[in-house]
Amino acid sequence: MMKHPYRIIMRTVLCATVAWSMCSCDDGHVDDPVFENTEDSYNVEITGKFQSLNTWRGTYSVAAACFNDESNYSLIQKVLPSSTEDTVQVLKLSNVPTNAKTVEIAVTNTLRKRIATLYSYPIPYNQRYSDTIKIDVGTLNVGMFGSINQFIFQGTGTNCARCHSAERPTANLDLTAAHAYNSLVNAPAEKDPSKLRVKPGDAEGSFLYKVISEGDENVGYSHVGLFTDDTYAPFLDIIKAWIDGGAKE
Ligand code: HEC
C-alpha cells in the first residue's frame, strides 16, 4: 500500500529541520562575513557647515583628520577649505589606514600635530573596510575664539568656567560658554581697572594675557601653571594671536 504523499513530504521537512538545527548548534566555526576584511583602508566622507574658519591667524589650521591611539600626529588630514559660512561642505579622505581610531575636526600645527579636538567620531570596531564612513557634523564653530572657548575656557583640564561662572563669579568674571566673549572683550579688569581684560589688537596690554602668561600680583591664584602642560601650552600663542588679530568672535 502506498503512503500518503503528504506524509512523506512532512517527514522530509521534519528530518531536514532537525538535521539543520543540530548542525547549527554544534558549529562554532562559521566566520561572520560582516567582519571580513576586504580592503586595507577606509574611505571617509564628512559633511558639515564650518563657521568662522577665516578668523584663524598664524600657522595653525583646522583640518579633517584621522588619528590612532599612539600619536598626536594625524595619520592623514585635509585642511578645511576657507569658504563661505553657509555652504555645506563635503570633505573626503581616502586611503585612511585601518589602524585609525578616530575621525576628527581638529586644530593642527604645520607638522600635523593635534593641538585641539573640536569634534571626534570614534570608528566602530566592526567598521567594514569596504564601506565609506559617512559622518554629518552639523554646524560647527571652528573659529579661533570658538576653539579657545571650547578647549580652554570650557575645557576639563583648565577648568576656567568651574571657578569663573555666574554661580562662582571669581573676580566677577563669567567664562561659561555663552558669556565668555562678552565678559572678556573690551571689559575692564576687576583686579587692575587700568586695563581691559581683552584689548583687541593688543595682547601685551590685555589683562587676560598677563594673568595666564606671567601672572599678576593682584590676582590671588597663579594661572601660569594651567598653561605649562604640553596640551595647553600652544594656547598661550593662540590666545595671543587671537587678541593681536582683533579678538574676533
Ligand atoms: C581654581 C580656581 C580658578 C581657576 C581654575 C581659574 N581661575 Fe581665574 N581667577 C581665580 C582667582 C582666585 C582669581 C583672582 C580673584 C581675586 O584675587 O580676588 C582669578 C582671576 C582671573 C582673571 C582676572 C580677572 C579680572 O578682571 O581681574 C582672569 C582674566 C582669569 N582669572 C582667567 C582665568 C582663565 C582664562 C582660566 C582658565 C585658563 C582661569 N582663570 C582659571 C581662580 C581661578
What does each model-found stretch correspond to?
Residues 1-24:
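Sec-dependent bacterial lipoprotein signal peptides
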